[in-house]
Structures are given as structure tokens and as C-alpha cells.
């Protein structure tokens, strides 16, 4: 599991590093550099792959721990989050191509839902986890709930307000084909704070906190190490030597 976590994290960290170097404000096609690497189609493609890898890290970790703790809630959530985020990415592409922010409303709502599912899963498995692991689980829950609040109180309303403003102004949206041609060729270079200020909050968190979370998932202990001693003894594969090894590692 750790090798796969390393690969997934490497892809996500690379994607964030790339998007830090070539930031793009997708719908209005705003970028910092007049270079093909700053095109929306490149930036959005990198983001799609990176974000799927990031959520796959969480799904993998949650699936392994849920299997060890026999948590049905966690197991279902671990199987649901990647397909849900794939749908969210499709909504994002719809918004990017058509310039309609309604797709971003759906995208961010799904992200909030997925993180809420992850938090609920961690809450469900925490009673079966060792006491010294619970502060870490609590930290994940607090961070997750802060993210959910941010998404539904800040991010989703922001995109909803943009869509309403576009509707009131009678904006004409692009077709999918027109959008593909547009994101591949049009770049609006801007260094004005007014153009970027609404993007700063999520970009700052996304390219810092989320990166460290991704890296930390590589170092998550083996699933059995999360369990309380009594729970480990009930595992079918946990023989005396294995339990002793886990207890020694815990000490």
C-alpha cells in the first residue's frame, strides 16, 4: 500500500507544483504567463489527474483501515469517493469549456459531500482504533469539517453568485466544441490583484496544506497498527507473533 501511496502522492505534488508555477483562472482564461503551459486545457488536465490521485490516496487508506476495523461505513465511503470525484471533475470540465459557473457549483458541492463522507467514516472507525491514534483521527476530522464548512459557506456560494451574475447579464455560453478550441488557444495575461483576489484563498490552501496532507498519507501506519489491542486479537490473521510485533511497534 505504501508504494502505491507514494506514486499517487508524487503525481499530486507534481501537479500542484506545476499549477503553482503556471496558475490559471479557468473560466475567464486568465493566466500569469503568455505560454502554452499556461493554457487552460493544460492546467485543467494536470488538475484532473492530480485530484483523482489525491482522492485515491484517501480511498486507499480508508479502505485498508475499514477492512481492519470491519467498518461497513468506511468501506462503502472508500468505494464511493473516487467515482464521485470523477463526476465532480466532469462538472468542472463542463464549466471550464462552456464558461458557465453552474458546473463549478455542482463540482464543489460534490467535493464537500465526499469530504463529509470521509469524516463520517473516520468517526465510525475511531472507537475501534488504539487510543494513541485517536488524536490523529481527531485532527483529520477537524480539518475535514473545516473544509466542508469552507466549501458550503464560501466556495459554493461564490460560484453560485457568479452564475447568477452571468445570467442577469445575459451571458452567452460556449458549446463544448467551441470551449475546447477556446481553452486550447486563448490566454488572457493579467497581473492585477482585482483579477486574482477571489482565487487566492483556495489556491493558498490547495497548494500548501493539501500537499502536506498528501505527503503525510504516505507515512500512515499499517492498518493493523491503528487498532486497539483487543480488536487486533480478533483479526483472523493476527497470530501471536504478529500481535507481539504490532505491540512492540506501538511501544
Residue spans for each PLM region:
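C-terminal transmembrane-bundle signature of multipass membrane proteins
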Residues: 119-246
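Hydrophobic alpha-helical transmembrane segments of integral membrane proteins
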Residues: 81-104, 230-250
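Short helix-loop boundary/capping segments
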Residues: 84-140
Amino acid at each position: 500500500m505504501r508504494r502505491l501511496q507514494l506514486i499517487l502522492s508524487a503525481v499530486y505534488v507534481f501537479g500542484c507544483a506545476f499549477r503553482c508555477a503556471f496558475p490559471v483562472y479557468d473560466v475567464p482564461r486568465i493566466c500569469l504567463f503568455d505560454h502554452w503551459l499556461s493554457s487552460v486545457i493544460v492546467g485543467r488536465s494536470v488538475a484532473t489527474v492530480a485530484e483523482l490521485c489525491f482522492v485515491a490516496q484517501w480511498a486507499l487508506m480508508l479502505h485498508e483501515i475499514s477492512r481492519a476495523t470491519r467498518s461497513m461505513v468506511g468501506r462503502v465511503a472508500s468505494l464511493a469517493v473516487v467515482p464521485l470525484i470523477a463526476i465532480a471533475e466532469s462538472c468542472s470540465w463542463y464549466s471550464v469549456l462552456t464558461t458557465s459557473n453552474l458546473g463549478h457549483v455542482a463540482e464543489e458541492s460534490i467535493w464537500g459531500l465526499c469530504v463529509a463522507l470521509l469524516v463520517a467514516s473516520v468517526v465510525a472507525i475511531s472507537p475501534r482504533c488504539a487510543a494513541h491514534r485517536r488524536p490523529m483521527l481527531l485532527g483529520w476530522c477537524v480539518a475535514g469539517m473545516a473544509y466542508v464548512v469552507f466549501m458550503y459557506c464560501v466556495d459554493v456560494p461564490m460560484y453560485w453568485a457568479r452564475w447568477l451574475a452571468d445570467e442577469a447579464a445575459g451571458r452567452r455560453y460556449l458549446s463544448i466544441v467551441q470551449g475546447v478550441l477556446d481553452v486550447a488557444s486563448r490566454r488572457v495575461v493579467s497581473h492585477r490583484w482585482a483579477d486574482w483576489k477571489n482565487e487566492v484563498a483556495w489556491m493558498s490552501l490547495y497548494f500548501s496544506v493539501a500537499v502536506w496532507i498528501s505527503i503525510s498519507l504516505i507515512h500512515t501506519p499499517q492498518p493493523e497498527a491503528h487498532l486497539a489491542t483487543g480488536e487486533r486479537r480478533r483479526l483472523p490473521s493476527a497470530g501471536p507473533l504478529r500481535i507481539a510485533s504490532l505491540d512492540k511497534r506501538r511501544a
